[in-house]
Swiss-Prot record:
Residues 322-377 are annotated as: Disordered. InterPro entries: Collagen (IPR008160). The modification 3',4'-dihydroxyphenylalanine is found at Y22. Residues 323-332 have a biased composition (Gly residues). This is Foot protein 1 variant 2. The gene is fp-1. Residues 336-366 have a biased composition (Low complexity). Produced by the byssal gland.
Amino acid sequence: MARNMNILTLFAVLLGSASAVYHPPSWTAWIAPKPWTAWKVPPPAWTAWKAHPPAWTAWKATPKPWTAWKAPPPAWTAWKATPKPWTAWKAPPPTWTAWKATPKPWTAWKAPPPVWTAWKATPKPRTAWKAPPPTWTAWKAAPKPWTAWKATPKPWTAWKAPPPAWTAWKATPKPWTAWKATPKPWTAWKATPKPWTAWKATPKPWTVWKATPKPWTAWKAPPPAWTAWKATPKPWTAWKAPPPAWTAWKATPKPWTAWKAPPPAWTAWKATPKPWTAWKATPKPWTAWKATPKPWTAWKATPKPWTAWRATPPPTWTAWHGHGYGGYGKPGKPGKPGSKGPRGPAGPPGATGKTGRTGATGKRGPPGYPGKPGVPGRNGYVHIVFDGYGKWEIGKIERKNIREAVAKAWTAWNAGHGHGWTAWTAPPAYG
């Protein structure tokens, strides 16, 4: 099994190296230097701002008043150093020490039998079978084609560096550092007791009103005309279907289908017979050995002379156990985990909780992604896009304004995401 896995791993590595070396022309062209390389370098102001201010460095270096408080008190240190009266009580009794030093009758019984020792010393037939095949050993020692590729500098190393403007901005001090250090006026206000604390604890008159049924419950239900209208088919269902041009394009064969197909060399290799197929089909020498009865099977089934000895403790053990020093035995093996107990009865229903307060307004969400272009309409296109800040922009756009509207939506999306990709790729063209 291990040999098969080694061979499969070899072909997986070879296939992975081949796929890593080959790139289509579009990939090679894209690897060229990008216009956003300089933009990604952090400005010097940022690099300087990230550094610790001198006040912080000096504060860290000054001794703190709580260092002495954290040290243990002298009384504890002195108590730890004094000898304890229970040290002698914890020592094992002399009878236990003498018993441990005497040879035990079961020492010889625990030794493995001579036939086992001899069998362990003989060479096994599976030793040679477990060694890796010579082809694998030679392949492991041969130089690999991807070693040189890994050692060459890559063109994207410089692209990953942050831009200088970002580094400079990081290094400049920020105006909010001092504001954070000043005490705030609301700190004291938060600590004072509030007048509404007692009001919240008193029962409210609207608690009973909330529990009574309201006359407008039936009024809120949708009218039957609305329910019937929802169930009838709508004339715009067919209008929402994709245009025939899209359906026809989806049905035509694409030029990249052949590019995605596996290379002929891989297909041919898969079809050729493999050398390990015959090896798997041949009978193995250990199959017969596994089927033959073993000499230790009968030995395991016969009663052992030490079974009775284990059941009856010797008198010396019983007498010694009366000393009360039984805590010096070896720790027992951990017990097996217990089975799962029966399911307990259901608890009483909990009390109805109070209505929670209205939550605070949430933070602005992340920028949205551009929507897909709408299907054709009577006045050109109904174009639905994101404006780059998580809001929908829906409206009818004339055909002559399609390109301008899409370009604006694309630029807004780039600005909302903070990426400078406008120079890298042009907005999609519609109309």
